[in-house]
Amino acid sequence: MPLIKEKTYTIDDIYALPEDERAELIDGQIYYMAPPTRKHQDISMELSSQIKAYVRSKGGQCKVYAAPFAVYLDEAANTYVEPDISVICDKNKLTDKGCKGAPDWIIEIVSPASRRMDYYTKLFKY
């Protein structure tokens, strides 16, 4: 029996999704994401605010972004992720659409549902 070939998706497929649908693209496969919980958002906003304030207090030029913020991890257009928090110090990585290449620092707020994806799948892509 022949093997069934999975479809390989691209960033264009991600952009074709309905606006209210959150997903990431890893090695050409789409992974849909549930909306974050209120607790998740509280943690994300507090960390983002603290990091941004620290960077400013030290006169740093790094930029701090909270999800949704696009990170394109390869030139082949088949890996697109949205870390919960991204810190980018190399301005050459920033485009109008997001960050090309791995941010200088990422933070993933891990929940039981996202543990495998955050600790394994995405970690090895960064």
Regions found by a protein language model. Name each.
Residues 1-125:
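Gly/Pro/Ser/Thr-rich low-complexity, intrinsically disordered segments predominantly at protein N-termini
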